Amino acid sequence: MVTIVLGAQFGDEGKGKITDLLSQCATLCCRAAGGHNAGHTIVHDDITYDFHILPSGLISPDCINLVGTGTVVHVPSFFKELDALKAKGLKEADKRIFISDRAQVCFDLHSVVDGLEEAILAGKKVGTTGKGIGPCYSDKASRRGVRIGEVLEEGVVESKLRALEAGYRRQFGELKYDLEDEVKRFNEYRTKLQPYVVDQMAFMHKHRSSPSVLVEGANALLLDIDHGTYPYVTSSCTGLGGAIQGLTLNPTSIKSIVGVVKAYSTRVGSGPFPTEQNNAVGEKLQKAGREFGVTTGRRRRCGWLDMVMCRYSNAINHYTVINLTKLDILDDFDEIKVAVAYKLDGKLLESFPAQADVLDKVEVEYVTFPGWKSNTMGATKWEHLPTNAQRYVEFIEREMGGVPIRWIGTGPARNHMIERI
């Protein structure tokens, strides 16, 4: 049966830890969409691991891992990340990771184009990671991209890459990009990549009887190309639909959909953020939560938890259970606010707005909770939480339509987790 872990907000919710926890029992762990723009950190046995394109199931020695068809793979980053994991003790990791032959190749060329496209936008930048994800997905949609399986065929990458470069040169003029170097490297990757490439359909059929399949979502619902705060989104489908499509899952095999919700809100890059706190509260959240992007190192924007957004996310992803993360970051606040409604021009909005400019204008209605002003870091039992912290959790649960909050994160370590049965 399949468990899918999905971000419910703007990403950086802390999906890595619950994925790590669930992967201990998983026989197969998969990434369905996105690329090396994603990033999360896992602390396991006092060792810190950073993941971007690779599934974090690699930490578990009995778990096979797949980078699925819906992803875009920057091959140098794939090998760099794999080497870093092996250097930290995961010696057999390269024997447990596979890539769909239908996944797209993200070239250095795409990263160069990403920067040029952002520069053209000037004051209206999307705030991408600069990793080339958008241009790569654009080439996929335009049917001129390169698939991973084609890397194994002599001459295919060179022919297609030269055509891509020529097209972008016509569009942007001279590029600060070494075409010959990238062609040379991919000629070398042809042999190096071969042991990792699989036919996903045959691979998934082979593992169809796996007792536990874990799908690791990247980014989050509000960054989804269709359902997110467009155009301030990533270029892939980051929700439930993307997981099913990117891995050709049988929907009837899905046992659990885990929505990961941070106890407050953060966002990296540009785009609307109704509950953002450009004040001492935001600075305190940023400092206490150590809110810097794993991929870019950029400081994350911080604000209060937004239940309007989370309810919208739940309506699309149909969570069966919630993992609430980083509750301990709120330990030292006198009061804690939660957004429960939006108004526009004095009128209550009945749904989450599709237009980014509308989200920029909404008036947020909050419910205010008294803080608990005591240390919850490392708590592992529900009864160890202060009463005010319990009330905060229970309120979120009600706002999510009764979807149970099964796990509560109380710190960075693997065992800093409360599980409510």
UniProtKB/Swiss-Prot annotation:
Example of a GO cellular component annotation carried by this entry: cytoplasm
Binding residues annotated for GTP, in chain numbering: 11-17, 39-41, 300, 326-328, 409-411
Residues that bind IMP: D12, E13, G14, K15, N37, A38, G39, H40, T129, R143, N219, T234, R298
Biological-process GO terms, alphabetical: 'de novo' AMP biosynthetic process; IMP metabolic process
Residues annotated as the enzyme's active site: D12 (proton acceptor), H40 (proton donor)
Catalysed reaction, written as an equation: IMP + L-aspartate + GTP = N(6)-(1,2-dicarboxyethyl)-AMP + GDP + phosphate + 2 H(+)
SUBUNIT field: Homodimer.
Record text on cofactor binding: Binds 1 Mg(2+) ion per subunit.
InterPro entries xref list: Adenylosuccin_syn_GTP-bd, Adenylosuccin_syn_Lys_AS, Adenylosuccinate_synth_dom1, Adenylosuccinate_synth_dom2, Adenylosuccinate_synth_dom3, Adenylosuccinate_synthetase, P-loop_NTPase
Localization of this protein: Cytoplasm
Metabolic or biological pathway, per its Swiss-Prot or TrEMBL entry: Purine metabolism; AMP biosynthesis via de novo pathway; AMP from IMP: step 1/2
Protein's name according to its UniProt entry: Adenylosuccinate synthetase
Organism: Paracoccidioides lutzii (strain ATCC MYA-826 / Pb01)
